[in-house]
């Protein structure tokens, strides 16, 4: 039995149909005999909507209160996905970041994970349940809610995979893998079958937004192999891993933008 961590971004769970699509992907993975931990982002534009709500009240909100507010987005997502999984007959439990054991420093809105306490996740897995975890959030030494910054759910997924020694860490997005440039903006892009951590960081420095930088750095530190996949199209994605002797140089200068 393999342990698989799957992360789904906001576009993958933005509405009812997308939530059930994700639930089917997760349920099929579990029914294949795997233990599954799912990390979920806030739905669609929820985070931006919450930021706008704060701006309606004040133009200078405290970072602590912003974290309290923004954490609500992921909590909605995990509850809805757990409901969908249970509706499909796949027993699931949703956990907030702090219930899942994320402990962070005190840097509100851009916290860093200091340790993972995996007892609760492990307990749920032993009960043969899918564990649905809110990405992007944790708890600091003051027992205050903290968030990890934009793209923090990727980092949450990698941290869980590292702490649990997962067999796979799959990052589901709305694109089919890692390309040499954004296929939505640039002609003649090429999807990469595999790419090294350093090359992924190089692409990110050039503006690629497939993976959060901190998540790639964490994956490199703990040698967590990542697989970038589309939640909308079941085709092979891109593996992000440490360099091996048989890997060719995969990157070349990005093509010119579309007119």
Located regions from the model:
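Short, solvent-exposed amphipathic alpha-helical segments in soluble enzyme
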Residues: 54-56, 221, 242-245
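Nucleotide/pyrophosphate-binding catalytic subdomain
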Residues: 1-217
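Generic structural hydrophobic/aromatic packing signal, biased to beta-strands
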Residues: 94, 200, 226-228, 240
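A conserved active-site cap/scaffold subdomain adjacent to cofactor or substrate pockets
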Residues: 217-232
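A broadly conserved detector of short glycine/acidic/proline-rich loop/turn motifs that flank catalytic sites
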Residues: 136-137, 175, 230-232, 244
């Amino acid at each position: 039995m393999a342990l698989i961590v799957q992360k789904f971004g906001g576009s993958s769970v933005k509405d009812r149909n997308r939530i059930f699509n994700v639930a089917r992907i997760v349920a099929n993975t579990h029914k294949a005999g795997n233990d599954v931990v799912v990390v979920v982002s806030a739905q669609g534009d929820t985070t931006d909507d919450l930021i706008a709500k704060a701006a309606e009240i004040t133009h200078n909100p405290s970072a602590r209160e912003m974290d309290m507010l923004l954490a609500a987005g992921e909590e909605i997502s995990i509850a809805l996905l757990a409901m969908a999984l249970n509706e499909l007959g796949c027993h699931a439990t949703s956990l907030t970041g702090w219930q899942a054991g994320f402990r962070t420093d005190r840097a509100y809105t851009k916290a860093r994970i200091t340790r993972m306490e995996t007892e609760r996740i492990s307990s749920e897995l032993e009960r043969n349940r899918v564990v649905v975890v809110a990405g992007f959030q944790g708890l600091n030494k003051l027992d205050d809610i903290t968030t990890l910054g934009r793209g923090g759910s990727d980092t949450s997924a990698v941290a869980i995979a590292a702490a649990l020694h997962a067999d796979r860490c799959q990052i589901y997005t709305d694109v089919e893998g890692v390309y040499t440039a954004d296929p939505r903006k640039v002609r003649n892009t090429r999807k990469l079958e595999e790419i090294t951590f350093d090359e992924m960081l190089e692409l990110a420095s050039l503006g690629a937004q497939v993976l959060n930088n901190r998540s790639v750095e964490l994956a490199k530190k703990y040698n967590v192999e990542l697989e970038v996949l589309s939640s909308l199209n079941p085709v092979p994605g891109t593996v992000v891993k440490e360099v091996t002797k048989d890997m060719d140089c995969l990157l070349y200068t990005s093509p010119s933008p579309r007119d």
